[in-house]
Regions:
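C-terminal accessory domains and tails appended to enzymatic cores
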Residues: 5-18, 24-42, 48, 138-219
Length: 219
C-alpha cells in the first residue's frame, strides 16, 4: 500500500501534485489543516508499505517516523522546517533543506529536475516566497498575467488551509488536491475548473475585505 501524507496548504498540495504527475500512484491520502503538523499519528502501516510525507515537520513526527520504520515501512520525506535529528535508516529517504528561500514544492521541483515548475511557483507564492517564485518564473519567460494567476492561485489555496476545523475551509484539502491534480499545470486547472478557482480566490478576497472592514470599524 502507498500512503501520501501532506500539509493541506499550497506547498503540501503542489508538492504532491508534482510527485504524482511524475510517478502516478494510487494512495491513501492523509492531510488536514495547515496547523495539523502531527499527521503521521493518523498513519497505520505494515511492513513493505511506502509512505510519502510532504511539508510536515519531521521534528514533530520523529517518534512516529521511528515507529513506522521499525514496522518495516519505507518513508520518503520532503520538508523545509527544522528537522531535529534525522535517523540513518535504509528505509528512510529524507530531502530536507531549511534554507529560507525554499519550500517543499521547490525541493520537489529540484528532485524532479524541474519537470513541473509551474506548480512549484504556485506553492512558493503561497508560502510568501515571492522572490524565489519570480526567479523560477523568469526562466520560463511567463507573462505578467500568467505570473499574477499563479500568485493568486497560490495565495488562495494556501489561505484555504487556515481554520479551526475542516468545515471552516472552502474546500477540504484532500478534495482540493484531487481537483487540482487532475490537471498537468496550474493554468490548465484555472481554465478547466474555473468554478473552484473562482470560489477560492473570491473567498480569500471577501475574507480580506471583511477583515479590513472590521479593522476600520475598530479604529
Amino acid at each position: 500500500m502507498h500512503i501520501d501524507i501532506f500539509n493541506g496548504d499550497a506547498d503540501g498540495i503542489c508538492a504532491l501534485i508534482q510527485l504524482r504527475l511524475a510517478e502516478p500512484q494510487s494512495a491513501q491520502l492523509i492531510t488536514g489543516l495547515k496547523r495539523d503538523i502531527q499527521l503521521l499519528d493518523r498513519c497505520s502501516a505494515q511492513a513493505g508499505d511506502c509512505i510519502t510525507v510532504l511539508d510536515v515537520s519531521f521534528q514533530a513526527n520523529s517518534k512516529r517516523v521511528d515507529e513506522l520504520l521499525n514496522q518495516g515501512a519505507h518513508i520518503f520525506y520532503v520538508d523545509h522546517h527544522q528537522p531535529g535529528t534525522i535517523p540513518q535508516h535504509p528505509h528512510l529517504t529524507a530531502l530536507i533543506d531549511t534554507d529560507n528561500t525554499v519550500c517543499t514544492s521547490l525541493l520537489v521541483n529540484r528532485h524532479l529536475n524541474g519537470k513541473y515548475p509551474l506548480w512549484a511557483i504556485t506553492a512558493a507564492f503561497g508560502d510568501n516566497l515571492n522572490h524565489s517564485a519570480e526567479q523560477l518564473a523568469a526562466r520560463l519567460k511567463l507573462s505578467q498575467t500568467q505570473l499574477d494567476n499563479l500568485k493568486n492561485l497560490g495565495i488562495a489555496v494556501n489561505y484555504n488551509s487556515y481554520g479551526s476545523c475542516i468545515s471552516d475551509l472552502h474546500f477540504a484539502p484532500d478534495t482540493l488536491y484531487r481537483e487540482m491534480s487532475a490537471f498537468q499545470s496550474p493554468f490548465d486547472f484555472i481554465s478547466g475548473n474555473r468554478a473552484i478557482f473562482t470560489q477560492l480566490t473570491q473567498g480569500y478576497q471577501q475574507d480580506m475585505a471583511n477583515a479590513q472592514a472590521l479593522t476600520a470599524e475598530y479604529r
